[in-house]
């Protein structure tokens, strides 16, 4: 019995010692694990880090956690990402190659067509196929804050080059389109309200007679949000849009003509959803093929290059306050005149962030080159 009691006592001591050692080991491992766990990154610092990363990295980092996914997908982060300037993001040039010329917003497309959206960085050797979309038109494409609005067969879609996702808007149920007439048009305009942080698409449908002796127009607005739908906006001044529009400081502007070809600029306040009209430059025709509508110095401007091939002279009409126009002249140097050959027709494709006007040949030529024109030089 004494031996058994001694053995039992020794066993109890060993058991207690083992439990103490086990507890000490758990505490030691807990301290090591706590030391290895990284401290939580402050939200401001996390946003600052993420906004400096390439878009492809952001798409991968959405899988890190639900917090990161919701943050990267939020409108707040998108706005921060757009305002950050970093050399890691070289400017990209997008072009759309369409295999059916007649598939655009002014004609009903009866044949399927496909296009390839290509993008290139500053290196001419770098060309990347971004997206293949059935019938993605190249003429009626509007870029706004990193989003691209494109139109195919009178249907508008929004493409995000960062996520490579495309959303098609529902068709506009217009009374004008229901009428069987060859003299009608449909144009979409893309706007952004910085106060309410909203994107809106405006659709203007017009029915007109020869020489514009009679014009009827309807106007529709679509808010880009879940469950969005087209809403008709009343405006008692019938007009025919003649150019794609642009959005400046929460206002959409576009060139148009009214009864008897009176050239005007139509403005649409994205937030209040109200239209107004401004008399266009008297010496410029809104129907001229050598006229572009661009943003210049944060203001709408008419780019008239009718005499560019003959004299090297370009007139720039800038819309100032109170609806007045100021005229500026751009002159090509003699050594640059060979770039605007008489056999090549150019189209104005917009402006860069540095204020350079983009001129591209209307048809595919070899070599195919794009002109960047400023008030000081042409590249």
UniProtKB/Swiss-Prot annotation:
Boundaries of every F-box domain copy:
35-84
Q: What is an example of a Pfam family matching this protein?
A: F-box
Q: Which PANTHER family match?
A: BNAA05G37150D PROTEIN-RELATED, F-BOX ONLY PROTEIN 8
Q: Which organism is it from?
A: Arabidopsis thaliana
Q: Where is the signal peptide?
A: none
The record's annotation in InterPro entries points to: F-box-assoc_dom_typ3, F-box-assoc_interact_dom, F-box-like_dom_sf, F-box_dom
Supply the name of the protein: Putative F-box protein At5g62660
Q: Which PROSITE patterns match?
A: FBOX
Transmembrane ranges, per UniProt, are none
């Amino acid at each position: 019995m004494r031996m058994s009691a001694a053995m039992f006592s020794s066993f109890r001591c060993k058991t207690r010692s083992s439990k103490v050692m086990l507890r000490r080991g758990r505490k030691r491992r807990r301290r090591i694990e706590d030391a290895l766990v990284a401290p939580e990154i402050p939200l401001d610092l996390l946003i600052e880090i993420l906004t400096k990363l390439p878009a492809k990295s952001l798409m991968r980092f959405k899988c890190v956690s639900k917090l990161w996914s919701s943050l990267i997908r939020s409108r707040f982060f998108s706005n921060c990402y757009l305002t950050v300037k970093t050399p890691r993001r070289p400017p990209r040039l997008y072009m759309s190659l369409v295999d059916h010329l007649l598939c655009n917003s002014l004609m009903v497309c009866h044949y399927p067509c496909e296009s390839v959206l290509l993008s290139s960085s500053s290196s001419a050797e770098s060309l990347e196929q971004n997206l293949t979309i059935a019938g993605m038109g190249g003429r009626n494409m509007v870029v706004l804050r990193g989003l691209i609005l494109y139109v195919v067969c009178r249907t508008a879609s929004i493409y995000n080059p960062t996520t490579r996702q495309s959303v098609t808007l529902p068709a506009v149920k217009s009374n004008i389109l229901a009428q069987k007439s060859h003299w009608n048009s449909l144009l979409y305009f893309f706007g952004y309200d910085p106060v309410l942080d909203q994107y809106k698409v405006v659709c203007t449908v017009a029915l007109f007679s020869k020489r514009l002796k009679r014009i009827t127009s309807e106007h529709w607005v679509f808010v880009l949000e879940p469950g969005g739908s087209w809403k008709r906006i009343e405006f008692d001044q019938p007009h025919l849009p003649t150019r794609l529009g642009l959005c400046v400081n929460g206002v959409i502007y576009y060139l148009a003509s009214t009864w008897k070809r009176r050239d005007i600029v139509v403005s649409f306040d994205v937030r209040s959803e109200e239209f107004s009209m401004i008399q266009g430059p008297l010496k410029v025709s809104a129907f001229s093929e050598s006229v572009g509508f661009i943003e210049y110095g944060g203001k709408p401007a008419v780019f008239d290059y009718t005499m560019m091939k003959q004299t090297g002279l370009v007139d720039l009409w800038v819309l100032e306050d109170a609806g007045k126009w100021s005229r500026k002249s751009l002159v090509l140097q003699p050594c640059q005149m060979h770039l605007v050959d008489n056999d090549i027709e150019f189209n104005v494709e917009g402006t860069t962030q540095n204020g350079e006007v983009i001129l591209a040949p209307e048809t595919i030529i070899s070599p195919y080159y794009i002109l960047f024109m400023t008030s000081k030089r042409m590249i």
